[in-house]
Amino acid sequence: AKPNKGKAGHNQYQSCVSERLKELDSFLGHRSPYKPEVNYDMHKAPPEPIMDKGILTKAHDYLPGWIKKYWEKEKDYPYEAGEGMIRRPDVVIVKDPTKPPTQDNIKHVVEIKFGNDEFGERQKNDYAEIAGGEHKVKLLDADECDCGNSKDSNATEVSTAGAWAAAIAGTLLYVLSRGKT
């Protein structure tokens, strides 16, 4: 799959990975063990996933709408972007895909870094809080992801999306199991 291009023409590999895993989750009726870009309310203990009201295994599609509807009405303080009030790991792997990605159902929180993007200490600590421990937080780098490989550019869009979602899911499984699958 080819990565999306940003406004300045830069490859957006992260959105490529996320889109493929979202397609897989949608294809599986929001029952995939791989949940991309789930937002977490860091002011709850433990941090709470922000999920679709009608489908508890599906991440909420529009964070600004959720903030306006819930944060601003339920909390005594305003939401401040960039202050770590909400965190969005790249991928959350759940134990039971029929349940939401709450701390007790999290197998791993995965962060994928491309280029010069760094995994800062505050981010690592927040992800450990989401996951329920540092041992559940995993880091993947660009070498462990196939976004950007254009060998199958003649494949149909649906088969390509399914193939890339399966490839990314397989890579996650292989890396996290240390090759013991």
Model regions: which residues?
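Extracellular, luminal, or virion-exposed ectodomains of exported proteins
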Residues: 1-7, 138-140
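Active-site metal-binding core of divalent-cation-utilizing nuclease and nuclease-like domains
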Residues: 4-105
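Hydrophobic, gly/ala-rich membrane-insertion helices/peptides used by toxins and envelope proteins
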Residues: 5, 10-13, 47, 59-60, ...
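Solvent-exposed, acidic/flexible segments
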Residues: 6, 10, 112-113, 120
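Catalytic cores of nucleic-acid endonucleases
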Residues: 78-89, 99, 106-107, 114-166
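Short His-Asn-centered micro-motif
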Residues: 94, 112-115
